[in-house]
């Protein structure tokens, strides 16, 4: 059922995101900025972005690997679903929620984690929502994309800090 919902939401997103391209005239889309940069800088930017995503996924995978298996709500390798475009735009929400829930479960036996609040859930949902709004074909989409990248980086840094704490010995109860 969960997969069915994800597929329906992904199809809806693709329909909404492609709508401006079927209108008369050329509507500036989410990637229209790349045409102004030229081919080589655009390729470098895209490769750099996907490389950053790989490091982010690796960080999330390590976080889940450092969570006791009984406390995980997702398998560590499933983090790499972030590369399944366009499915990832919906899956990102589920990944962020599952990582946060796994950390909440882990906190019950690892009191070192109590200082991390919602374990980045708000940041993760924030960057995921901003990522969706970045499909708006105007300045609002561009601003949303920038906000999404900023929230994503802050989320990444937080999870890196959490990962360091997970690698420390657990204090006695």
Predicted regions and their residues:
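Membrane-interface extramembranous regions at the lipid-water interface
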Residues: 1-39, 44, 48-83, 87-132, ...
């Amino acid at each position: 059922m969960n997969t069915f919902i994800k597929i329906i939401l992904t199809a809806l997103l693709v329909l909404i995101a492609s709508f401006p391209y079927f209108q008369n005239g050329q509507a500036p889309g989410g990637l229209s900025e790349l045409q102004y940069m030229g081919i080589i800088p655009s390729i470098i930017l895209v490769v750099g972005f996907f490389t950053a995503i790989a490091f982010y996924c690796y960080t999330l995978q390590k976080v889940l690997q450092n969570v006791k298996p009984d406390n995980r709500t997702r398998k560590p390798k499933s983090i790499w679903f972030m590369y399944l475009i366009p499915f990832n735009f919906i899956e990102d929400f589920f990944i962020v929620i599952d990582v946060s829930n796994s950390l909440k479960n882990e906190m019950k036996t690892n009191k070192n984690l109590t200082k991390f609040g919602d374990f980045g859930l708000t940041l993760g949902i924030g960057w995921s929502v901003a990522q969706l709004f970045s499909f708006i074909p105007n300045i609002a989409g561009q601003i949303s994309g920038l906000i999404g990248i900023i929230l994503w980086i802050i989320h990444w840094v937080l999870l890196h800090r959490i990962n360091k704490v997970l690698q420390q010995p657990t204090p006695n109860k």
